[in-house]
Amino acid sequence: MMQAKTTGLVLGAVLMAGPASAYDAYDPNNCNGVDWDDQRPQVVQKVIAGPRVHFIKSPYDDDFTATTCPADTEACRQKSYLVTGDFVLIGKTQGPFTCVVYQSPLANRQVWAKGWLPTSALTTVVPMPSPKVSDWIGTWYHPGGEIKIARGDGGKLGIEGGMTVPAAQDFHTGELKGNAAPERDTIAFVDDGSIPFEKTEGECRVRMQRVGQWLLVEDNSGCGGATVTFTGLYRRTK
């Protein structure tokens, strides 16, 4: 099996919501978030339906009683919704639905939303095909942290970032610090950049792409403490 695992974006909240025996992580009807895959970059999609598209429940919703979901029924429709133009990270599909997670890059705090959306309400956003160096350089913000990209030595870019995630009694932190050269539309590096990304060595694995005005960052949840991930869309602040 390829290296793939669910990020800490939303799964922890699910496990705290009810008895562990009621939750089946392998139930294909459960939307658990997005996965890291060594072989495949994260895909961003945009909501094209509207003006509102409501999330659809998983069986673990409503205190694990939404057993008939996901389905296109009033009982399976969540109160929360997205609007036309919102960008989401996508996970698996189940029938006519796609599992998505959403975090506004403009928010001041980390509030991830997740659930099923009708696949017909989404369209893929293609990454910038050949970003220039100037397209990467800058300070990029995401709720909870930021990443700085600057010119480095030997045609590489120097990348530094920090992330803070609130916990029950304290907070957890993560750090990125490496040098990497863009290849086509992607920056990919492991730990400090000294390990080739193609190898399965190292702990902190990171990929970056330019998607619209945003910097898409994804990691394997190995770049910090428990529940810490840099995964998300970042906006350039300077």
Language-model-derived ranges and their functions:
Residues 216-229:
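Short, exposed beta-strand-loop hairpins at the edges of beta-sheets
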Residues 145-192, 217-220:
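N-terminal glycine/threonine-rich, aromatic-flanked beta-hairpin/loop signature
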Residues 129-147, 230-238:
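Tryptophan-anchored aromatic micro-motifs
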Residues 24-41, 75-119:
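SH3/SH3-like beta-barrel superfamily modules
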Residues 1-9:
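Bacterial N-terminal signal peptides that target proteins for export
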Residues 67-77:
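Short alpha-helix capping/helix-loop boundary micro-motifs
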